[in-house]
Amino acid sequence: SRGGLYAFNFAATYPARVAALYLDAPALDLRGWPGYKKSHWAEVAENYGLTVAALETAAVSPLARIDPVVRAGIPIIGVSGDADTVVPLAENLAVLVQRYRAAGGLIEVIIKPGAGHSPHSLADPAPIVDFILQHHAPSR
């Protein structure tokens, strides 16, 4: 979840260092993070050198930083449960999928029916591993 925030923003900032992204139940829009404890907001704000108030309007949410990742040609695989109430699929990964594809980016998604926020990954992680290996770019 929060790792998706940091991983995506790393890719947007340093695209030459990223061959592919694996996002699992990613928090991609800080404004729509209903299941997240407000105490964690302070930590996220501190990591970005912002106040909690400034965090709500700053362009640090991955959904505001899609263009550099698409331009770099970084493929993404995302996994999410369709019953996640901590980081809702419809407000995060589903929005990224629509916007990323509309911008010309490659994104594959695996939806876990009936699954909530945890456990992360898949019982059989082979589809994730295969995607990463298929899109691994040693030159990056």
Task: Give the label of every model feature segment.
Residues 9-19:
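Conserved hydrolase catalytic core segment
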Residues 69-76:
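Short, proline-enriched alpha-helix->beta-strand connector loops that line the catalytic pocket
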Residues 4, 28-29, 117:
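Active-site micro-motifs of SAM-dependent methyltransferase domains
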Residues 1-9:
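Glycine-rich nucleophile elbow surrounding the catalytic serine of serine-hydrolase chemistry
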Residues 24-25, 79, 112:
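Alpha/beta-hydrolase-fold catalytic nucleophile elbow
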Residues 86, 91-140:
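C-terminal catalytic histidine-bearing segment of alpha/beta-hydrolase fold enzymes
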Residues 19, 26-68:
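Mobile cap/lid helix-loop segments that gate and shape the active-site cleft of serine hydrolases
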Residues 77-80, 84:
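Short beta-strand/loop motif that positions the catalytic acidic residue
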